[in-house]
Amino acid sequence: MLPLPNSLGFSLYLSTFAGQWSTLAGWTGTGTPVFLSLHISEEFDETYCRRAEEVCCMLAYHGFRVIADVSRKTMEQFGCADLVELAKQLELWALRIDYGFTRNEISAMAEKMPIVLNASTVTAEDTAVIAGRGREVYAMHNFYPRPETGLDEDYLLATTRTLQSAGLKVLAFIPGDEWLRGPVFEGLPTLEAHRGMLPSAAFADLAIRYGMDGIFVADPGLSRTEANRIRMFCQETKVDRKSVV
């Protein structure tokens, strides 16, 4: 299971992997979770599948736990009929299921490997059925590139509490500070109030006020100063919640 909540996860983009590796290299061998989307159309080219497999297998080799965001588009791009088999091929730890799959399809996958649901779209009925059949089922909030589109405080708190009451661990995103993802370059927070906030402050807010089980920086870049502040927060506060390891 993920070593949460006393840790930080990262988001990785194939188009910026070379520049991001210098940051990720400092977290090798720690079981750090990495979120990676496998259905970003603008990244698709004739080398995409090979590059994706190389990056995912490299991350697994260095001890990272890769959560891949997948959709029907992913299956078309890789020419596969079974996402669980693709996960084995790419050495993925978990699949974050996006659009295009039925409750039964997701439940079948959840019986075989960790599954992450979309916290904004999953229904209470779906949650109960999938969690009842799955070995490890999580819910992940989205991040929001454009100003004024992120979640508000009341909605985030209520949704998170509902999902946790159903037995799911809930994950969310904070913005980076050193290298923001384009084309908007306004940060990628889950909570609109965190846009422009220091990552360490946003991390502490999600951990303490919202009781988030796992927190990922969504932008490609996090400064060493902010990474160290988050590490210190995790070490010193020792949030009084059972780890899901």
What is each PLM-predicted segment?
Residues 116-241:
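Catalytic alpha/beta core domains of metabolic enzymes, predominantly
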Residues 2-132, 136:
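Active-site beta->alpha loop and helix N-cap motifs at the rims of alpha/beta catalytic domains
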Residues 244:
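Conserved small/polar residues in nucleotide/adenosyl-binding loops
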